Amino acid sequence: MVLKASVNSFRKIFGWGVLSFFCSQIAYGVSVDTKSYDPFCGVGVKVAGKTLVIGWDTPEGSTELTLNLSGQGALVRSVAVASGKGKVIEVVRDINPVTVLTVGQRDLNKRSGWTIFFDRTSRKPSESGPLTLKLKSAIVRSVGKRCMVDLGELHGESFSGKLRFTIYAGCDLIHLQSVVQTNQDARALLYHAGLTCDPTGKTVSWIGLDDKVHQVSADMQPAEPEKVRHRTIALETEAGSLAVFPPPHRYFYPLDEAYNLGFTWRGNDFMNHVSGFGIGIRQALEGDRRWVPWSNAPPGTKQELGVFWLPSTARGQQLFDRVKAYTHGDRFVEVPGHKTFTSHYHIEHTTRLLESREKQQGSVADEVVNTSRREGQDWRYSLRQPPKDWIQSSFDDQKWKKGKGGFGKKGTPGLRLGTDWNTQDIWLRRTFKLKETPRDKLKLSLLYDEDTEVYLNGVLAASVKGFSKTYREVPINPEALKTLKKGDNLLAVHCWNDGGGQAIDVGLVRPMKISRPREMPTPEFVSVFKKAGVDIVHLAEFHNRLGRDRRNPDKALPLLKLLHDECIRLSDKDFLLLPGEEPNVHLGGHWISFFPRPVMWVLNRAKDKPFVEMHPKYGRVYHVGSPADVLKLMEREGGLMWAAHPRIKSSTGFPDLYREEPFFKSDRYLGGAWKAMPADLSKPRLGERVLDLLDDTANWGAKKYIVGEVDIFQVDRTTEFYAHANINYLRLDHIPRFEDGWAPVLKALQDGAFFISTGEVLMPRFTIGGKQSGQTLKLVASRQAQLEVELSWTFPMSFAEVITGDGKEVYRKRIDLTETGAFGKQTLKKTLDLRGKTWVRLEAWDVAANGIISQPVWLE
């Protein structure tokens, strides 16, 4: 939707003409600079006494925002809304925008720069404080069909800049941004934003995780986080309401888990930095307690700390429906001729099902030596490395500290915290008595995060790596089991942790035979995907403690069989769940495997093993032990592979380091996976790391593509799935049946017949010279071709960009879209000069950094 200015409507709203407003005016001491303001932008502006009044038409009718430029009292004098042609009604009055900045340290050495995920930012020193506005200037300017009011100066936590209000003609949003920068290097940040006001006569509302609207009186109770749907909290008055919410994806830095951490707040004295009552959005400083990198803030970059206000005369569900429209209700909507595909999930469903079946088939735990899951048990512990004989009963641990189990960090899954532990290593000892020598085979009951060694009476009982979210029953080494005796015995434990969640607790259990009915429930993640409009899900299982079992045929094949069985059980005519893995061997870095049918393969090849053999139970089984084996497997089975999180995490340096390898040059190697990682709030696009990779590989002469990945573990009805997700729209006319194989899905990927979207911006049609993405265009003599792209969107658009390359350089041509409003669609047609170019692709981004990414069209 391209908007046209309606000066008469603003005269109706304000009772004055906007065309008489030129150059600058004085609002009682504060100069208002309007040299760059054009009243035909569709937003009316005037100075009235000590105030700046902004008015514009909206789908509801019209809105009027009055800013107090006196420097005294609340900055926002009022927000008023008119329904239809009715009278403007003041919805809220005397409110102050607030932004609290949390600044931490970025490790620029570990990965040689800003492209880093494995950074323990949340565990390093940080400081939080409000950004304070000292009103010294007001600049009003317009760009296209939008008007910006910049107020200076804004200062706090070594950052400085301005507070910006952006109004989009024809749109009901008020976009607030603290645009700030720092001169200090190696900084990472989080921000928290909202508003403060007098709570008298007001209520606060939100949609809870039960999907119901909740409403409470606004009062002066201490501020607390609220877990909500759609990342939105609202202030309600008798006249209407004001919803507050963040950019739906940009606000959320990358994490391994999509936990709902309570991203809104309400109450008094927020973070001990905001005086009085308020509501707003927030980030939890500790994140998911794993790797918590926050957002990059390089020196000199203008960080846009944004939040949206949506004022309305509506309240409750009606208000939230208006907010939800901007993300289609957190749903990836249908695009004709396309099916939605999402990839890279470590849901561990197979693992949990396997554990559940083990219990159904035989055991519950009778604790012989109690764990601390119900009541804290007494331990001796040391945070310094002890002498070598610390595992022996004769060792004197009286100088060690005393503590209750479990040990770790608050919030670590499965942990009942007894004693805080936040160093890298911990050593524990505990004496226990047995009334008699055990006749049954006992097991360890073990909760751990991360690598753990357990000793019984000085003999190694078990060693585990990684982490568990629940107590695991771990077999005891027979030699250690033999040491158990009547009377005193010793448990000695060493646990090592490298960041994120942190936990250790140990006991001994006796398996007891039981009889339980076998249940096959549908896991919650299936309904979450379906509700979000996802048609096809590609898993990346066994990226946990079972990953090493994939190298052992005796363990790997039953795991794969169970995975395949569950995928077919949970698939139906409208939803396809597909097996996949994220191996970390053979190629370099981490990579994703994808086959067009169930394939049995083992991630190891012993010296005496053939590449392929017929198994009496599982049929054809492949054994892969080298890059050549992997490539041969992919060629035989028509599979695809690509780099997981390329150039970051455990794929740092890849695929660049193996770009000359045969498997990379093969058509079986798709390319890389796209995710908005790392985060940088100064960037107008998300995920530049992988967009640059796409351009680089195209210039290498390799026809590769990038597929959107989500790369999270838990997905259930409590998670904030949509904020962390993206989607691939594949050019498919139907969802394949699992039983028939899903070769059309792989073909769409291999052909580049898809685009990536965050969900708010869509691209139903895209051609250059009549060719779609992944196809090859033979240029005519003029070397010109016609771009035709159909776009639709919810938030107002910012720009589209045509990206081309010639085998050496990358070229960008921006198409300005600031004439657009909210909830529009447009077909762009443009003649492109493609002389000397070998490929071309397109991106389009909105004002909240939501967008679409095409795959390349190849040029000859």
Language-model features: where?
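Beta-strand-rich recognition/accessory modules
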Residues: 232-337
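Extended carbohydrate-recognition surfaces in non-catalytic/accessory domains of CAZymes
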Residues: 363-440, 470-474, 495-497, 502-505, ...
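Acidic, contiguous internal or C-terminal segments within carbohydrate-active enzymes
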Residues: 63-69, 137-203
